[in-house]
Amino acid sequence: RMCNEKIYRDMKLKIHFSHKEELWNSWSHAGGILMGFVVGAIFLYWCFTMHNGWATAGVILYLFGMLMSYIASTVYHAVSAWSKWKERLRKWDHAAIYWHIAGSYSPITLIAMRDQGYWGWSLFIFIWACAIAGTIMSFARLKDHSNLETICFVGMGLSVLVAFKPLIDSVSTATVWWIIAEGVCYITGAVFYSINKKKYMHSVFHFFVLAGSICHIIAVWDILMKYI
């Protein structure tokens, strides 16, 4: 009996969200999955129609990162807090955020910035290297470095500032503003993520992520219209 009580206490400590919160967390990013498939079909149809290999590669990586992130998040939050899969899915959820960020950079670096000297390829390689390293880190003990992960997410997102001049030389002014708006959404979301022990703050974070994704979708569409 004492052993069972200890297990119960240990599992209870792992529960951060109520059932209603988890419903909001799950369904909000389920909307991201639907959005990703609809937008993906449109983007890929356009790339295939224009017979542009680089655009197709950039869009596929982008869709992979975005969809894996939303799928991992949706499944993780949908699974019962008492499930043995919960902790494993949490690791995938965190790892997929790195893929989402790296995927978001792919259309920019492989389409718009590919001819900007070494900038496009350097940024592409750096971001995906960070994603691989972040994935490895995510499968370590997350509670030991959760704040470090948040810093890494924001750092990866802001790394485009290093190549900001080549970026604005490659895309339209409207695209730049959409990317800036995206960054504002993600950084604001990160603030709510950092206080997610307060009720529904994690759900608010999810909606800011969705808003950032919408901004990036518009930016990628602008890039596709300009280059293919």
Indicate residue ranges for each PLM-predicted region.
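Multi-pass alpha-helical transmembrane bundles in non-GPCR membrane proteins
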Residues: C3-I228
